[in-house]
Every structure is written in C-alpha cells, then in structure tokens.
Amino acid sequence: MAKLVHDVQKKQHRERSQLTSRSRYGFLEKHKDYVKRAQDFHRKQSTLKVLREKAKERNPDEYYHAMHSRKTDAKGLLISSRHGDEEDESLSMDQVKLLKTQDSNYVRTLRQIELKKLEKGAKQLMFKSSGNHTIFVDSREKMNEFTPEKFFNTTSEMVNRSENRLTKDQLAQDISNNRNASSIMPKESLDKKKLKKFKQVKQHLQRETQLKQVQQRMDAQRELLKKGSKKKIVDSSGKISFKWKKQRKR
C-alpha cells in the first residue's frame, strides 16, 4: 500500500545575498545570473562559428569593387583606409566646435532668408476688413435721396467694391485705351489670390520656427562643449535646459 504524504506547503530555500562581512569580495552570483551569462556566452560562440564558416568558404580570388579603396597589412588584415595608420578619423574638440559653428551659421542664413520672405509677404497681405462704409449726411431728406453711384462717381457694378473701385472717368479712360471694363479682376479672384499669399506666408512662418528651434538646439550643443560647471534641469513638461555656475568676469 502506498504511503500517504500530506501535500503541504514546504519551505522555500532561496539563495541568499552576499554577507555584509564578505562584501569586499564583490557581488555573489546566483543561479539566474549564471544562466544569463552562459546564454550570452553561447550566443557569441554561435555567431563566431557562423563567421568562421563564412570566412572558410569565401573565395580568396573573388573580385569586389572595394579592393580599390582597401588593402591588407603584413598579417593579411584589412585596413579601412588607403593611408593606413597615417589617417586619424577622430576629430579634436576644436574641430568639432568649428563644424558645429559652420552648421549653425548655415541654419542662421536659411532662417534670415525665410524672415525676409515672411516680411515681404506680410506687407503684401492686406485682407479686406469686414466693417461697413458709413457715410454721414445733413438731413433725412438727403439720406432718402442718397445714391451710392452718384456719391462715388462710379457705376452700379463697381459700387460694392471697397477696393479697386474705379470711377467713371477711369473706366472711360480704360475704354478709350481699348480696354474692356470687364477685364478688371473680380473680387473673388482677388480674395483667392490673397488666400494663396496667406498660405505662402504661413509656410514661411512654419519653416522659420523650425529653423529657429534647430539653431537654438545647435547653439546649446556648442555651449555644452565649453568648459565650466553646469547643471541639467528638466521641467514638468519634459523640456531640458542647462544652468551654468555664475563666474566673475574680469
């Protein structure tokens, strides 16, 4: 007959941490740490094995265009540059500052161009006001007898135009110069033209704002390369700024 054993909760034997008295020996590795280290080691070994197989199967006489810009040393190892060890790809701190200054000047030039276009478009952009043209008369009789065509000296077709309203003399002069009065640009066309200019001004404004942000970011990066103690500040919105320690200038 099988022996009956109570299936009760047994005590969990957990791995302990490094004792305080042995803390000078460093971190005490547990089993889960060993598993991670072993998996990483085997992953790297598998990658190296695949690379060795590819190198073994590669044809040494195979031609490829990169041969013109590369060569091997005495041990058969590839050198990334024609000049070998004579060429140093790393830049000094002064060279990095100079490059960032040149980039910032280029962005500043583009921003000035956008500002000029924005100012020019804003001067040309003048929409018609939504107000009414109020005319004052001396008496009620004159108000009843008032006719806008006679007051503005124009035709009934041109009365409703608050801008580009031509008088009868101007219309007669256009007709005498073999111009048709109907060739004058209508109000709807003028509004469409101004709306197009408004969209262009809006695009210039957006580009100028983007270039301004880029210029500020590049100026901040260039300032961070300089010496001096600084403190990184992050506000509630996540915006990052830096504050330098005050120094007395002589």
From Swiss-Prot:
Residues 1-10 have a biased composition (Basic and acidic residues). Residues 1-23, 219-250 are annotated as: Disordered. It is found in: Nucleus, Nucleolus. It comes from the Eukaryota. The keyword Transcription regulation does not apply. InterPro entries: SSU_processome_Utp11 (IPR007144). GO terms for biological process: endonucleolytic cleavage in 5'-ETS of tricistronic rRNA transcript (SSU-rRNA, 5.8S rRNA, LSU-rRNA); endonucleolytic cleavage in ITS1 to separate SSU-rRNA from 5.8S rRNA and LSU-rRNA from tricistronic rRNA transcript (SSU-rRNA, 5.8S rRNA, LSU-rRNA); endonucleolytic cleavage to generate mature 5'-end of SSU-rRNA from (SSU-rRNA, 5.8S rRNA, LSU-rRNA); maturation of SSU-rRNA; rRNA processing; translation. Keywords: Nucleus, Ribonucleoprotein, Ribosome biogenesis, rRNA processing. GO terms for cellular component: nucleolus; nucleoplasm; small-subunit processome; sno(s)RNA-containing ribonucleoprotein complex. Component of the ribosomal small subunit (SSU) processome composed of at least 40 protein subunits and snoRNA U3. Interacts with snoRNA U3. Interacts with EBP2, FAF1, MPP10, RPS16A and RRP14. Involved in nucleolar processing of pre-18S ribosomal RNA. This is U3 small nucleolar RNA-associated protein 11. It comes from Saccharomyces cerevisiae (strain ATCC 204508 / S288c) (Baker's yeast). The gene is UTP11.
